Amino acid sequence: HTPQSALASKLGFTAAALANIASRDYLARHIDRVVIGDRRDALLWMKDKFDGFKTHFATLTTDNLLPALLASGTLPLIMQPVRHIPGTPDGTYWDGGIIDYHLAFPYSRLNNSTQGNLVLYPHFTDHIIPGWLDKALPWRRAGTGTHSHWIDNVILLSPSPAFVRTLPRAKLPDRKDFFYYGVNHDERIRNWKIAMADSERMRDAFAAFVAKPDLSQIIPLNF
């Protein structure tokens, strides 16, 4: 759908948000998913319908790279939408996080793939939220409900709560910091750099473990 005014966009997103409270399938009546990717990866595991959203597939080209990149970060109601991306369906494009916030896809389909049975999912938190509008709906998290099997073969790699508590303000940096620090840019930047340095040490420790695994660091899973 292509709203013709800011008011139409606001009304449309209000309707979509209310629909999402009831069901993601109801949200799918308002928004389609468009996947723009490398022609060398057919994404066959995503081609069979897996949720209520109509999914379109398009090839990434030199003509649509920039508008697709812009659309992927275009926040609804804050930024002007992107329209007419070459090689894609006509319509109005916004940040795909509205429906695919943390990419809660049917990774279990890859179990029969020649690429391997396990999916490594580096993440910034210990749970996967399907859509941005689902952030306040914990029952929508991946691993729960009728689609819980989607992540049976996923290894979720995320910072531990203990690590996060060591960071400035005991949290990961995010856009809310701009409001918290206000015009105190020096403190915000200093704390961000501290968090980045600590994260780099965590990265290096993980890389060292991958290169030379230390089984004494492994905690068995109890099923």
Regions found by a protein language model. Give the residues of each.
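Patatin-like phospholipase
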Residues: 1-223
